[in-house]
């Protein structure tokens, strides 16, 4: 059992981000910091700090005197992020091919975990390992900092994938 105040902003941020990415908190849903604090057994301060960080990531909309909401999925923004992702990942792949990098050992575990998640119909584990797979590609290409910059934007695609698969029954 967690003790009040034992979770800091970083842990609360990770928990709330996951709940938004994996649709435990749905787009458009109202968020009450006091209710989240109670559920997470923390004070309201780390919740408020986490919500401000999530606002910067595009996952939360905060309207003073009106409320805080999980951001709706902006399809225009999503289209732009997908475009950027195609361009950047294309360059990463060209770099890796040019290096003739032997990535099999570094990437095989993520592929095996994705295959297992697919067999078990575990979309969350599939998405997490796909994310780790792409992070490993960026690192292998020498672009770890680029991944750090663009990764928060790629998370928005995760929400769309989760919503799509949930609505299609897949």
Language-model segment annotations:
Residues 101-163:
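Conserved amphipathic alpha-helical segments that form helical-bundle/coiled-coil interaction surfaces
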Residues 165-170:
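Short, intrinsically disordered, charge-balanced linker/junction segments flanking boundaries
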Residues 1-98, 135, 139, 145:
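Short linear motifs at protein or domain termini
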């Amino acid at each position: 059992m967690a003790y009040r105040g034992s979770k800091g902003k970083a842990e609360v941020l990770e928990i709330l981000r996951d709940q938004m990415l994996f649709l435990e908190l749905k787009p458009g849903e109202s968020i009450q910091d006091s209710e989240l604090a109670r559920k997470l057994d923390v004070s309201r301060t780390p919740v408020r700090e986490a919500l401000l960080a999530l606002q910067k990531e595009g996952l939360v909309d905060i309207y003073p005197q009106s409320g805080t909401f999980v951001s709706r999925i902006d399809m225009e923004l999503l289209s732009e992020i997908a475009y950027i992702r195609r361009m950047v990942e294309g360059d990463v792949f060209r770099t890796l091919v040019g290096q003739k990098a032997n990535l099999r050992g570094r990437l095989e575990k993520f592929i095996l975990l994705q295959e297992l998640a697919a067999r078990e119909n575990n979309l969350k584990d599939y998405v997490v390992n796909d994310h780790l797979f792409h992070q490993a590609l960026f690192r292998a290409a020498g672009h770890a900092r680029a991944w750090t910059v663009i990764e928060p934007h790629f998370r928005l695609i995760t929400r769309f994938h989760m919503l799509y698969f949930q609505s299609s029954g897949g």
